[in-house]
């Protein structure tokens, strides 16, 4: 089931929640709506579901205009952040609920419902919980049951609103990998909302970055992370260092160092901001012509990763550097020592006020 959104707008009073959004989601695609709070991602998801009506614009499923269609007629499955399981029902009864409340003409037999429920419980690897109640399950298990319940009605589209937001970090990481494998198996067009950059990068086929009701960029995780279209996307997708830069003849100059900048090949010098991610900086223990002298101010070891905070000698600008713990140990430096840093890559955005 493909989804096509054309010039969709939604206001709540004077607040612009969704602003002229155009988006196409292919059949079987797993798409992440990623953005900070208030960016419009959940409102857009609810418009797709039919839980909110757009002020203007068109929503199509497989080319059919369903903009004014009631949520019950759209064939969507919805999973919320807080499970929404019925506490007084067993797991089996929760998963079966959407089938048992169908009109008699379209309702499967009890045997067919039982077969479907047990099949779904096996799919989410919880077939042994059929007779238990939600209170007897962990948060991660409850969310998987909520997903099984959404799948029971064989939705054309699966919509997930921050499905792992209420879970601890380890369970979230496990469920992300599980959701990716599950999607590859069932191949239902899926849209999920998240503010977690790592979650979107790990799980999605396509990421749609939203801010202030608009789409800032959309593309594969690799495209969005490696080639951000603007400063907002660059800063939102992970830590970044900012340097004032001068750009001319395909090179950017940061202080006393020069970095290739082939996207800016013009002959006239321009000012801009150079964005450099912490892992794109090399640390040296000896001075070199094309490096910045720094002092090591803080070292934080997080498992296999070493995170450094260094201060530049000239203006004491704080710079974040990330490398493996093994690489850091090999450098043989510690807090208070001098070192030299060399950005391997930078992305320069030109213009005043950037």
Curated annotation (Swiss-Prot):
Domain ABC transporter: 3-237
Name used for this protein in its record: Sulfate/thiosulfate import ATP-binding protein CysA 2
Membrane topology: Peripheral membrane protein
UniProt record, GO biological process: sulfate transmembrane transport
Originating species: Shewanella oneidensis (strain ATCC 700550 / JCM 31522 / CIP 106686 / LMG 19005 / NCIMB 14063 / MR-1)
Keywords recorded for this protein, A-Z: ATP-binding, Cell inner membrane, Cell membrane, Membrane, Nucleotide-binding, Sulfate transport, Translocase, Transport
NCBIfam families found in the cross-reference section: 3a0106s01
UniProt subcellular location: Cell inner membrane
Family annotation (SMART domains): AAA
